[in-house]
Amino acid sequence: MMTLAAALVFLGMAAQKPVATTVPGDPMATQCYTLSNGLKVFLSVNHQSPRITAHIAVRTGSRNDPAETTGLAHYLEHLMFKGTQQYGTSNYEAEKPLLDTIEARYERYRVETDPERRRVLYHEIDSISQLAAQYNIPNEYDKLMAGIGGQGTNAYTSTDVTCYTEDIPANEVDRWARIQADRFQNMVIRGFHTELEAVYEEYNIGIAQDQRKIFEALSAKMFPTHPYGTQTTIGTQEHLKNPSITNIKNYFHNYYCPNNVAICMAGDFDPDEVIAILERHFGSWKPNNNLYRPEFAPIKPITAPIDTTVIGQEAEFVALGWRFDAGNSLQIDTMNVVAEMLSNGTAGLIDLNLNQPLKVMGAGAYSDEMTDYSMLLLLGYPNEGQTLEEVRELLLGELAKLRAGNFDDDLLVSVVNNNKLQYLRALDNNRARTSQLVNAFINHVDWAQEVGKLDRMAGMTKNQIVDFANRHLLDNNFVCVYKRMGVDTTEKKIDKPAITPIPTNRDKQSDFVRNILGEQVEPIHPQFVDYSKEMTVGQTNKKLPLLYKHNDLDDLFYLGYQFNFGNTADNRYGTALGYLDYLGTKKMSATEFKQRMYKLACDMSFNVTDNYITIWLSGLSENMPEAMALLEDLAANAQVDEGAYSNMVEAIIKSRNDAKSSQDECFSRLSAYGTYGPRNAYTDIMSAQQLRNTKPAELLALVKGLRDMQHTVVYYGPMTQKELDKCLKKVHKTKKNLAAVPVGTPYMEQTTPQTEILLAPYDAKNIYMMQYHNEGTQWEPEHAAVINLFNEYFGGSMNAIVFQELREARGLAYSAAAYYRQPSELPHPEYAMTYIITQNDKMMDCINEFNNIVGTIPQSETAFALAKESLMKKLASRRVVRTGVLNSYLSAQRLGLDYDINSVIFNALPGLTLDDIVKFEQQSMAGKPYRYLILGDEKELDIESLEKIAPIRRLTLEEIFGY
């Protein structure tokens, strides 16, 4: 018989059981919970594959950084991967006094101004860090996630959010929850000075990106008395070099509490089981009843345009911004609709009036929702000879049309319909679901309000839009930032610190990790694609090859016409198909065509690659026949517009020249040049002279002729095959005897018979570097398992050798990787590559370390077993669904296969040993000649040491770009 005391305990426990709330009409069927400690939980079920996307969102970001240590929220995000009192260490009791000493030294270091004294203090920090490192077991969090089959382990920080992301097998919720509960309650700051250096490398990447500069400058003027404008998420150079562990701890204890956190999950699970697990592991997490969030006085309205300028070496552009209310304001619905009425990529005012007639190089409208305020932004890139001031006036002119109601009556309805289409597509993706949940939580948007957004949009009228624009989007209440080309003299060079590499201790394992990974869970059995069952390979009634898969989940369709030739056969097709974007037909102008397609909520795209041309149509199935007819009419009857062609050519030429100012673009071209040689996908293009001399009618003839060439129809949608045949017969009219497609000469990866260095110029504080080795080895299916396992072990994750040695142990880079690449198509060969972005004066450190670990691969049975287990769990829980089945089939065909290669990999993995991996690496990578591809500022590099490796061949931008 139950005693009174026991009954009271039972009733108390029952009262603690979280109760779900739902919102009628929610397409995601989200179940919302609040635990007794204030922790929010949002669960959305999606049974497509046995995996779960799990995001843990903390309602804090750089907005709440202490003013004297900006960047703190972001580098706390990094430190959350360093372990707890239970893992990441072999002896926390012995480690803690050393960590406390490091903290105290940093408090002295950050206020010290004497350079010599700072050097001595940093040396002390480095020395004590060596003592602490004997207990440190780096990457144990990553090992835990790998061990349970996690993938996509990451995090991000912004103004108002710090979010930790995972994608786990559906059978691993309990172990994931235990790990996270410990992580969020017992985080320990260790490996601090090497991780901080990795953050600084991330800062170096950002300073070469002018879009970051313009956003920061715009925010500074838009929010002059608020942290959105007075500080940045990455932090200042000075603050990053003078951090405070004490401030980080205080920040963590204040904001990382259950009443300031949400767990957002989407995937294959039973909500009742999941909430019970979360209650069990997170329920004892103590709330912060004194949670402090700084508040700031309202910002004064902008009553006159505020102009500012930033300097950088990338292409010029202009940005305009208007300030709006908090992210949970109903005003934001209208702001987002207005942004899409201005620019949606197809039929917005800016799309039709500026982009299509090429009155500017490119322009668009974007919205940015934040917790305290939001923004609507307009961006514009000038044509050759056009000033930024002229672009600004053109953008303001489109706003004037909005205020005057000078837009098509169907535009608002079309925007709403396309939002519904985008929402429907997003339901297919677990990450999209969790991101929506996270954003609502961070911005204090009630879930019922979020669910009702589309209905509220549907209820908007043209008069409301016009009134909104006249109240909020004026020609005197905005900020304007001009991004001009030049040398930014504010960027300072800081020499690398003297860091003694910390030991990786990769064979050590904490009891916590050993116990967690030693547990047995009910396995998920793999399901590989059986193409004979999952899809139909057949013919249309016109004898066209057909790849068909029925969509029984929703009303979306994807229709493609694939031609088995591409740029290698005729490099004019990309330009020809791009030209269609500016043309109309005898029946419709270019503007009318785009408006009609957008109203149908259908998208049309052309994809020209090395060896394939694909014309894609997608959207709502009920509108597919009309969208097909529009596409066919455009391809067959597009009207030549000489002016549009001339403008397009000049825009292409300018965009090519602008690309030379981008660090990312320059490295992409150098990588292609070093891999394929002077003839590659970037350089095998129509020259400026060819573009100018070509008659546009010739290009339209190419497009018109496509329909009469051999091609394959690819379809995923709700139509039956018979219905599709009928539709194709009526609309997609082809000749009885189709012409053969032209044959191209493929761009082939070059072999590397000797070591050499290719150096291309770019003025930046860091280098981009790739090492490339290719013996011309032909790929075989039997190679796939050992290659995939090698990549998992050596260079493919945060738990891999490369990440541990280059970033964790030495702080040499933010981004580093190494892979043995498999081809996507035969007869292309396999090849090896490494990749890193690092500060200029760390170049030789990176090269030497890469050469060390490639020359003699570090061996760890523990790490190998974990890599194998992780890869097998990922493959077992992987499901290929929807259009993925068709894409998987096409990929297999290009490798000469008629089966899912993952089945071969999975079945071979159990028999592979560490010796197999070592042997493979020694045969394929160690001691081989490599081609070093380095993009950087030569005067900042150790050229003397480089020349000891191999002769340097200096390339010009003209050589790697081909023009």
Regions found by a protein language model. Name each.
Residues 38, 47-96, 320, 330-342, ...:
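Active/ligand-binding-proximal structured segments within catalytic/core domains
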Residues 204-207, 220, 290-347, 379, ...:
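His/Glu-based metal-binding/catalytic segments typifying zinc-dependent metallopeptidases
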